[in-house]
């Protein structure tokens, strides 16, 4: 029987690649619901191809346009928060792919867990902001959170060995600015920062990769996903992006997961876990690679990583504020309003001004997120050209 899935964020990079994986295995998946923020044309094309029972656009005006484009009585069209929650809880769905950027889908993910769904999680901001809340809910309900990020999928696979974990190592390519002096980074254009050397990703995560903020967010995410102490998680720069993560056990044994830089691999593993299916990808040729490089990150050149590690270690509402402030700062950079180096200035200022809540509930997390967005916008305006 085909596995029914819902895709939250179907028009984004991960959502599109998820549907590529689904299309590569005809008859083995059934797309029950698709959710997008505002891309009505692409969502309409996806709806026509995969024929879900439900299609949702968060933008209510565009949802009306979508209804006219689809015009199929067998497909329900909904909008806004109501539609998002309906898609997350749709009856018969086994797995919800959470691939929307930011924490807008947090309530929907919690509702999906309550409705008995497993989650294939590609949204790191949700676990950064509310990791304890989400993981506690999943454990209480005996539901599975399966990571989609390549690094966390790699850790997930390396942890199948059993035994006490001494250390987890997350790798980073170093991004397009890996060898650029800090003084030159202020002149980097959005086009330069979006030119990632190994991965094809959405714009927000690509900029986070350029600043190494992404790696700091991944450390926080790993802490919650795998119930680790913060100091058990390390970061190494690995330009080839072949080794995605490593796990060192207490006996000194070190397990690594290697593979090509192709997001379809971790996406498919999340969709098919605990099974492993065939996938048409170019095999990794280690002999052709010849060598693999590893180095420690330079926290002075990449202060966003240091800010993320500090916020993660402090806990409480600091990670939620970090994530929200970064999202706003990245939007300003992509719009050409601030420099790349100003991203860390915005995030640092907002973190410094934050009055944390040590053990936040859902309302506390959402309030911290909203405050951080407002404050980051004000700080960014002050730094804008």
UniProtKB/Swiss-Prot annotation:
* Required cofactor names: Mg(2+); Mn(2+)
- Please describe what this protein does: Catalyzes the NADPH-dependent rearrangement and reduction of 1-deoxy-D-xylulose-5-phosphate (DXP) to 2-C-methyl-D-erythritol 4-phosphate (MEP).
* Pfam families found in the cross-reference section: DXP_redisom_C, DXP_reductoisom, DXPR_C
Q: Which GO terms describe its biological process?
A: isopentenyl diphosphate biosynthetic process, methylerythritol 4-phosphate pathway involved in terpenoid biosynthetic process
Q: Where does NADPH bind?
A: 11-14, 37-39, 123, 125, 202
Q: In which pathway does it act?
A: Isoprenoid biosynthesis; isopentenyl diphosphate biosynthesis via DXP pathway; isopentenyl diphosphate from 1-deoxy-D-xylulose 5-phosphate: step 1/6
Q: What is this protein called?
A: 1-deoxy-D-xylulose 5-phosphate reductoisomerase
**What are the coiled-coil residue ranges?**
none
The cross-references to InterPro entries, in alphabetical order and at most eight, read: DXP_reductoisomerase (IPR003821), DXP_reductoisomerase_C (IPR013644), DXP_reductoisomerase_N (IPR013512), DXPR_C (IPR026877), DXPR_C_sf (IPR036169), NAD(P)-bd_dom_sf (IPR036291)
User: What GO molecular function terms would the record report?
Assistant: 1-deoxy-D-xylulose-5-phosphate reductoisomerase activity; manganese ion binding; NADPH binding
Q: Sorted alphabetically, which NCBIfam families does this protein's record hold?
A: Dxr, PRK12464.1
